[in-house]
Amino acid sequence: ATETQNEKVKVKVETVSVQDVEQLSEFTATVEANIKNNIAPQTPFRIEKIFAEVGDHVKAGQLLAKMDATSLKQAKIQLDNQEIEFKRIDELYKVGGASKSAWDAQKTSLEVARETYKNLVENTQLLSPISGIVTARNYDSGDMYSGGNPIYTVEEIRPVKLMVNVSESLFTKVKKGHEVDIRLDVYGDEVFKGKVNLVYPTIDPATRTFPVEIKIANSDERVRPGMFARVTMSFGHMDHVVAPDRSIVKQSGAGDR
């Protein structure tokens, strides 16, 4: 045998160990508003005045826009007349001077007039149904609203929510209240805390996943709808055999083997 053949290969022995490894899964999602309301009247009106601008914070019940009040004024006159007429019929009915059918007919007319007036009040003064931020305004004062785009969009962003699709294999492990870590590309490695708010009860047979809704309190409003998010969920710890990375020899062209 040659000297080269007799040369022994030097081998360094490394010790493998069992370590407690956290079981993590990562998901991606787009941030959504907790509630999104499109605000517009039920029927066409001219917009008399706009009171809020994009970016404004508004409270529930705050006046956003005032529509032309011509129809409202006419409805108020009709309501007043119906109330007067009903009072007259009611007094006659009590003394036998009017029939029950006449009394019923007038009462129905009064109720219709009241409902019409109430509906016009709600559609003449547009109020925000939620506290939030104005994210869209599609009309100006003086414009004619005729349908299509809403006059305003208001979104509630305290909290915000994320929807992630989780593998069927984790169905029994995800529970309401489960705390998660969230990273947003715009904020780098900063971690935001969220909680599972809703676990959908069925599996999508096409993707073998189920939807999970996560909420972020977002009290400082730094997280905004549309941001790209990475969600990390922890599913406890398991013991795994761990070998030092330097002790692994990878074969060329063998991928991760």
Language-model features, listed with the residues they occupy:
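Short, compositionally biased
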Residues: L72-R88, V166-T172, V196-I203, A243-S252
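Amphipathic alpha-helical coiled-coil/rod segments that serve as protein-protein coupling scaffolds
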Residues: V16, Q23, A40-N149, K161-M163
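Surface-exposed patches in structured soluble domains
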Residues: T30, P44-F51, H57-L63, L127-V186, ...
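Short, conserved beta-turn/loop elements at beta-strand boundaries and strand-helix junctions
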Residues: V18, K36, Y139, Y200-P205, ...
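Acidic, gly/proline-rich low-complexity N-terminal segments at the extreme N terminus
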Residues: A1-T28, S128, K173-K176, D181-I182, ...
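Short, charged beta-turn/beta-strand-edge "cap" motif at the junction between a beta-strand
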Residues: A65, S71-L72, D185-D189, F235-D239
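Edge-of-domain interaction segments
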Residues: A65, R222-R257
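Short, solvent-exposed secondary-structure boundary/capping segments
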Residues: N123, T202-P211
